């Protein structure tokens, strides 16, 4: 690509930025706390795709971008790159989550029961006010509500396929992975992937460009405690409590190399409450790592190369929007090549 330096437009760019800030003055009147509490799913989406858990910063980013969630995630990701790293926390076990909502479409009767929690899945999608005024729920203390996955009984019976763990956990925030892509890198990429992109890829596998029709073995939203080894005392301390979503999808039974038949599963996890993203991630996990659903490059979602390079919203938006920047030299060279080719063709005649 060719670029050309622009000097004369510096003042125009400055004025454009000032005008943009002027048009967003009404956004500044909105309190950050109101965004956090009133637009919680938007905040969760930005934290997940921005790869930084901070409701306050995500809310500020939403205000700064006037509700453009892709742009807000960009702000948050950029801020993340400037944060100092002090260490690595202990791995979160989703079986130890304090559950606010947890259901299974694979099993009717499960340990702890079906906990519907707060959801509008069962609501008619009409824009009406005050249609659910009566409060008929029972209060429960989520601090004591710790239940293992509904698929755990099958796992204890050794009926579920286990994938081999990576010898070394990748960190895509430090080094972008290269082929062959470790599963830890793929899962990290999906964890901070753009929800719409992941839904689109997952849907291709369901609708006809693949062969996935999963059953939700266990999907849960709630809080997880983050623990960290103190650098001085060397004791394990609690450093944060995160809202998270985790999903285990059950695929189908698959014959293993040792001849045993086991159930394939996919796993999805993300910051905040975003069940659609977690389900999509679990479906993509199935398509990428289960031979039953993977048929080479015939299906979009079965191609790790396709997936890992096309689901990041910040990357996709950044590169797409860069086409608005000056490409004068590039286009002029195209015109020159066309002109020369036309002249050459005329001379040959």
Whereabouts are the PLM-identified features?
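Short, amphipathic alpha-helical interaction segments embedded in low-complexity terminal/linker regions
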Residues: 1-223, 251, 345-349
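Acidic, serine/proline-rich low-complexity intrinsically disordered regions
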Residues: 140-349
